[in-house]
C-alpha cells in the first residue's frame, strides 16, 4: 500500500513559479485529495477548502515545489467526482478480466481517476504530458509495477483505444 506522501522520485523539473509546474503540483494535490476523500470519507467541499487554505504548498523530502494552481486543482477534483461513474467504467474496461478498479490500491485509483478525467474530459495539456506526469506520480508513490500499469492504462485511454481491449492485449468476453 502506498503512503500519502510521495518519495523523492517526483520532483520539480524547472524553476518555481512556472504555470506548467503549478499545474503539475495541482495534479499531485488532486491525487492526494481524492485519496483522502476515499480513505477518510471527507466531503468534496471540505476537502477543497482544506487543500486551498492549507495545502497548496507542496514539499517532498524537504524540497519545495511550486505552489499548486488552486483553480486547476479544483477543476480536476470536481471533474473526477462529477464524472466518476463513466471514469470508473473506462478504467475497468482497460483492466484485465481478473482485475477491477475496486481491487486496486486507493492511491492508484486516485491517480488513474485524475488521469482519465484529464485525458477524457478536461485536460488542455498534450496527451503525452498528462500520461507522463501521472506516471511520474505513480512512480513517486510506488516501487512496484503500479507505475507501468498507470502508464499503460493512461496511454491506452489517451490514444482512444477500443474499450474491449484490456491492458494485456486480449479481447474481453462479449
Located regions from the model:
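N-terminal interaction/assembly modules
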Residues: 1-174
